[in-house]
Structures are given as structure tokens and as C-alpha cells.
Amino acid sequence: HAVHLDPVKGAQAIFLSEFLYRILTAPLPDEHLYDHLASSLTFWEGLRRGGANYHLCLLISLLPVLGISPEISERPEGAGWCFSLSEQGYVLDRHAHCLSPEETLHLPQLLRMTYANMHHFAYSRQQRGVILDYLLDYYRLHLASFPQLKCLPILRQLGEAELEGKHLPSQP
């Protein structure tokens, strides 16, 4: 499906353009990164359906390419362990950059998401939003000068308006 004919792909395109603009700041070309992006975007372009998780999958697939993949070892025994986005490991004392204990249980499965299996991850729009927020927080913590993305509040407002059947005011 062409991006302009698919509202999900259209929203993803807006998000991906700003996200990629922010991560493609290296002064020297990175052939591995560009090859990965080329194959990922070619896959996305060919998607006919089941692409609601594509943006999450792309962000996850870029973690090892950018050298910031979290080390997910076996979670320690006992209750209350959280995964710290800033420390890239499990902690008992939850802080601002931690997943909840329940979210921590799902992290290893999420990080196994690939383009081939992403359609099996049945997340609601709200769950995808939470996952996206955590992924972007992780990028901000581990990539120097990675800012808040400006398109997200706008895309979320558009998504909420679409769900409620509202039309946003047009600009003169």
C-alpha cells in the first residue's frame, strides 16, 4: 500500500521521518546502519497489512546496530525486580527510568520482535504508545543529543480524534 493511501503508514511515515532525522547525525557514513535501514524500509513499503507494530520493530532492530542494545539476562528470582532503562539491568529500587515489574516480565519477549513475527504481537493502541514511550526514553538515555520528538503529541491528538470520530480544526 502506498503511504498516502494508508493512514497507519502515513502516521508511521511522519514519526519515522523525525526519528531517523534525529539518529542519522553521525559525521561519517555508517554502511551497516544504512543497509539495515534500506532493507527495513523496503520491507515496510511492501507491507499490505499487519504493520501496526512496524515502528516498534524498527526501533528495536536498530538497538544493536547503534550499539545500545540492552543486555537482557535472566531476571533475578523473587518479586519486585524492575528493568532500569538507564542502568540497562535489573534493580529492586524502582526509579523514574524503570519498567514496572509486570512490564519487566514482558521485556525479553518484546525484544525478540522481528519483521517476520511482529504481526503476532497483539498490542492495543495504548500499549503501543507505552512501549514507544519507553523505547524513546531508552534512546534519549543512551544516545547523546537525542531529543523529545515533536511529532508525537500531534500524532497522538490525531489518533484520538480519529478514534472519537472528531475532525480537528483546519488551519486557515
What are these regions, as identified by a protein language model?
Residues H1-P172:
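Non-catalytic alpha-helical scaffolds and adjoining flexible linkers that form interface surfaces
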